[in-house]
Every structure is written in structure tokens, then in C-alpha cells.
Amino acid sequence: MEFSFVFGASAIGVAFAMFLTRQILSKSNGTTEMQKVSDAIKEGAEAFLSRQNRTIFYLAILTATLIFILYGFARATNEHDPVTNPVQLGLWIMLSFLLGAACSVVSGYIGMWIAIRTNIRTAAGALTSLNEALVIALRGGAATGFLVVTLCILGIAGLFTVINAVGATSVEKIPLLIAGFGFGASFVALFAQLGGGIYTKAADVGADLVGKVEAGIPEDDPRNPAVIADLVGDNVGDCAGRGADIFESMAAENIGAMIIASALYVGNQSAFESAGVGILGVLLFPLIVNAFGMIASLVGVLIVKTDGNENPMNALNRGYYVSTGLTALGFFVACKWFLGPFWLNFFLCGIVGLVTALIFVYLTQYYTEYAYRPVRSIATASLTGPATNVIGGIAVGMESAALPVLTISAAIITAYFLGQSSGLKDAGLFGTAVATLGMLGTAAYILAMDNFGPITDNAGGIVEMSEQPESVREKTDKLDAMGNTTKALTKGYAVGSAGLAAFLLFSAYLDELRNYGSPLESVDLSKPEVFIGGMLGAMLVFLFSSFAIRAVGSAAQSVIGEVRRQFASLKRLASGDIEFTKDFKPDYRACVDIVTAAALREMVLPGALVVLMPIVVGVLFKFIYTANGGEGAKGSEVVAGLLMVGTIAGILMALFLNNTGGAWDNAKKFVESGNFKDEKGVVHRKKSDAHKAAVVGDT
């Protein structure tokens, strides 16, 4: 029955995604001028993703081979292993890694494929009405969201079914064999987000600084040689990268929850059996609640609509509230159905996760929408120049990390104690796992909102480049400003769910040490080696961020140099703006090629850093521990310190960078909206000094 429900719900998800895709493709694809712009975006996005996936393929094969060797030949076996034959263990872990990596690549490609076909239809929809464009953009994002969530559920459930069918191990140990699926998904997501992120921001910086600030031309102006690269970046970074990111989050957290569920059932087997609760229901509980959440999100997507007078963000929020409410109902049914008399506390844990997700959405909107104080304060700071804009943005970003951390902390402690008081032994971790599942319950709708951002951004670019009427651009600008907020809140949502999951994964690391014969009940930071490990973890976050930002800067410099080269033959007016001649034809392909090569080149070093650092630290301090005759901290304890402090620092850094970027972007949009007034009542618009300062902050 459990498998029937999981696979049945997945079939509904696939059918709905196909329905949405066919509905979108049946819409008008606009004028001939629109189609020319769209074709250029398609070509650039597909070329980049093809080259990026080829690079990831080689890295994944190398890593999979290393995993097989380590598990099959280098690692000593123990009685807790799911299979006794080490070669068989290595083979299953390697295969699950490759399947997770492949599904993650497909998730990213799906996101990009649908987005580059939805953006032109959103632009064409804006010719009709704001509501038409809104519905097309959201449903395009939803098609991606449902396919990604379904692919995750099907991948894990399918692998579970195959291993169970061949009898490779007992049912309760199957989650240990599919752990590689989550690692494969994380591996691909890391490089997909790095490559896509570097591409996106480098193209954006190059297009804005030379186009808006130096040349004095509008955003997405067809005379800007970097504008196509900028629009391509929205697809490969925000659509493909985020699709792989959400897939990775769901995969890792579902598998982690299944492993914890297995341990919970084994430790409380008599209590479960006396209550008539079967092991499959407990093990597959994470997939079941995800399936309920997907169906709930389906309803949320279908009810979204607006009129010309309403703030379109209200329509998106309505859909999210409906999805959240129906997901809570799904949690109730799943807990009552599969957890027997222990259902109430775990249902409340799921509600904790859903409420946490809601709070994260509210907080991100508060810090990134220009309807609220933080973004407006940055716009006000722009009146005195770029320096004060940057100072104000950094201050807002730092402030924005406080309340989310308090929210995560409250969610972890509440869910843990609800689990502990459920009547089952050692159920605190499972309570936290269920809260994490609650946060991910509306993942399909959240991913729809995330993809809404780059789709509307591209639609605005297509409208501008095809020289549509100003009234059409006003509609896409309104949707684009919303998209900046939805992108930011989705990233905040991902950080929040990762924060809850980090607690689970760290506990899983300690369990693995216990199974391997090196139990570690606590991490003692008073030991100098462990303290050093913690400092190295925090350093890793800053070093990784430095490499990523430097990569963006390096790639952006190349783009800026190319755009300036193409503008060099043009005259400048007394105002400093460039005077364009009728025969000037920008070379879009040159900028696309430059930023593609730079992104693929620059993504390897930061990616390798985060993969190799824990291994190097563990091996180094293991050698030091052995050389000291067993005195001091073991290498595994030092790595625990690195993971613990590194995770905490990473959460804070992610919140800071995400909200700062979203706030700067919408501060610029606020100035461009024509509603920004200084204390004297003077309106500041595009091309004003305040706008130029806001553009610097945005880039």
C-alpha cells in the first residue's frame, strides 16, 4: 500500500507537470522580434548547460570510481554494514551515487528547458494582461517544480524497490545502501550552482556597469552586447541551478530521515509491532509526506490569479497559504495512517516545520521587498552615493541573519522535545527530521515561485529588446520586482531547510562513527585540535565565498572588457552617454562565449575545496593523533568540529549574502518604479544619481 501511494502520487505529479507544459506551449510565442531574442537565449543556455554537464560528468565518474575503491577495498567492514561483502557495498553506494547525480542533472536541465520556452510566452502574455503573464510564468515554474519533486521521490522509491526486490539486505538497512543517492545529488548541485551562479552574476555585472552606468542605456537594451549573456544567466543559474539545489535538499533530507526512521523502528520494534505499525510505513513516511505536499502544491498553483489593481505578490502568497494548509492536512493523514498511536507529537513536529517555512518566507519578504523599511532605507542611502548604498545594504544583510537563526533554533529545540515526548525511545532526532520534512512539504510550490523570478526577468528582457510599448514593459517590471523577492525567499527557504537538516546529518555522522567503533558522544571544543577544526570550518566558508566572488569578478572583467571594446568606436556625448549609430550591431555571441568559458573554468577550484577539505583535515589529524601515541583528539573528532562550526558559519553567510543581494536589487527597482521620493518630495527615477548609486549596489 505504501509503495502504491508513493508511485501513484508521483504519477499524478508527472501528469500535472505535462499538462502545465502542454498548456504553456500552446500559448502565443509573440512577435517575430520577440522570437529572435528568445532563440538567442535558448542557444546560449543550451550551449552552456551542455558544456557544464560534460564537465560534471567527468568529475562524477572520477568520484564514483573513488567511492567504489574506498568502500569496496580500503574501508574495513563492521557488523553494522548493510551488506557483509565490501565489494557489493561499494557497488551499491557507487550506483546510488551515479543515479542521484544523473537525476540531479536531469532536474537542472528540466528547469532550464521549460524556462527558456516559458519566458517568451510570458512576454507575449503581457501584451494581453498582467494576469495572463503572471499565470503563464508561475505555471512554467510549477511544471519544473513538480517534475523535480517527482523525480526525487521516484528516484529514491525506485532504488529502494530494486534493492528490496533483489534481496540485497534486510528492509531496515536499505536506506544505508541508498545514501549515495543524496551524495550524488549534492555533488552535482554544488557544481551546477557554482557554474551557473558565476555565469549569472558575471554577465549581470558586465551588462549593468557598462550598459547602464557608462553608456547610459536602459536595462536589457538590445544595443548592449552583454544583454543576451545576462538573460542566459537567469536560466542556467536561477532555473537549472535552483532545480538541482532543491532536488539535492529533498534527496539528502529524505534519505537522512529514512535512516533515522530505520534506527527508530529497530530501537522501538516491540512498541511499533504491538501498535500494529509496520516497518515499511515508518521507512517510507518521508516520501509519503512529500507526496502529500506535492498534491497540496498542485491545488495552490491552480488558484493563483490576479486583476490589474491587486499587488500580484498577494496572489502568489494566497497560493502558498493554500498549499501550506493542505500540506498540514496531508501530514495529519500520513501520521495517523502510518505512525499509529504515536502520531500526534510527530504531526506537531510537521506543523513546526511548516510554520518555520512560513516565517522564513515572511522574513525574506520583509528584508527584500521594497514595500518595507530595509529596502527603502537602502534606496534612501543611494541619495548620497554608491558608498552609502553599499554600507546600508551590508547593514541590512547582517541584520537579516538574526531572526532566521532564532527561528531555526526554536524549530530544532521544539521538534526535538516533541519527538522525545512521543513515547518512543530516542525519538528526538526523528522529530527534527519530521520538522525538516514539514519545511520541504511545499517544495513544489516554492520551486514554482523561484523559477517565476528568472522567467519574468527574461520576459522583461524580451519585451525591452523587441521594443514593445512602455505599457507592456511596466507589466513585466512589476512581475520582475516580484521575481526578485520570490528568488530571495526561495534561497532563504533552502537555507532554513538546510539548517534543520544539518542537525540531522551531523547526528548521522556521529552514528557512523559509533558504528565504525569510534564512538563520539560530544564534540569537545576545549581540545586544541577540535578548536582548530572549528576554525578551519569557519575559514572554509569564507575561503569558498572568496573564491566564488573572485571568480565572478574575474569573469565580469572579461565581459566588461569585451563590451568596452565594442563600444570603443562610438562617440560620447557631453553627458558621458554613448551616441549609437544606426549601423552599430552588437556581437552577443562574443560575450556569451567569454562568460561560458570563464564560469566553467572558475567553478572547479571552489568546488574541489569543499569536497577535499574535510578529507585532508581528517587524514592530517589522524596522522598527528597516531604520531602522539593516541594523545589528543582523533581525526574524526577534529572533522566533527570542522563540520559543526563550518555549518553554523555557512548558514549565517548564506543568509547574509542572499538577503543583501535581494535587498540591493529591489532598492534599484524601487528607484526605477518612479515612486521613490526624498524628504523634500522630489521624485528620483531612472538615470538619476540615486539610480546610478543603486545600480552599483545591485551589481
Which residues are covered by each model-predicted region?
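Hydrophobic packing and interface segments
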Residues: 1-699
